[in-house]
Amino acid sequence: VNNSFSVLSYNMMYCDVHKFLWDKKSINTTGIANTLDTLSADIKCFQELYNSDEFPELQILKKVSRRNPYYVYMHSNVGNDQGQGAIGLAIFSRYKIINKDEVYWPPNNNGMLAADIVINQDTIRVINVQLKSMGIRVNKILNEKKEIDKEETKNVLLKLKEGFEVRGIQVNMLENWIDEIRDVTFIIISH
């Protein structure tokens, strides 16, 4: 009996939705969305997924399942108890998802998403995690073509300090989740 399975993790960077909404012609949005269902994996974990039924280019849930049916679990949005939110983390599985759990860290749609998935006779827990971004935009700093002054250095160091503190709390929450897992093999997918 073959118990192997494949896992894919991909940060979608919101499919460049801001540019798409601005000009409706974003090559990034269309390219990412059209490529998703061609990426072969039994379990697909996405971070920063953006789904919208308003625009065909952003119907990501449909696009990923177009060629292969998947069980889908996505971060819930406020007022949406079905787990099929519009933005955040998502787990797609060719195998049945029998249990789900999530922790949401606003305001940036980060958090942890867990799915218990039955593969043959075994159950595994897949945990899709996205920790707080450090908020440092290196390209912005480099593109300004100026010497990084003391003020900019101070700002970068403050962002790093805040990011490490928040990430420490988030990692502790992840450790608590792991400590609660009993009799189930688990894998952690993180961006």
Positions of the model-derived regions?
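N-terminal secretory/membrane-targeting segments
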Residues: 2-6
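Active site of divalent-metal-dependent phosphoester/diester hydrolases
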Residues: 70-91, 155-183
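Active-site beta-strand/loop signature of hydrolases that rely on acidic residues for catalysis
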Residues: 7-12, 32-58, 115, 126-130, ...
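Structured beta-strand-rich core segments of catalytic domains in phosphoester-bond hydrolases
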Residues: 1, 33, 37, 43-141
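Acidic/histidine-rich helix-loop elements
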Residues: 9-29, 51, 135-164
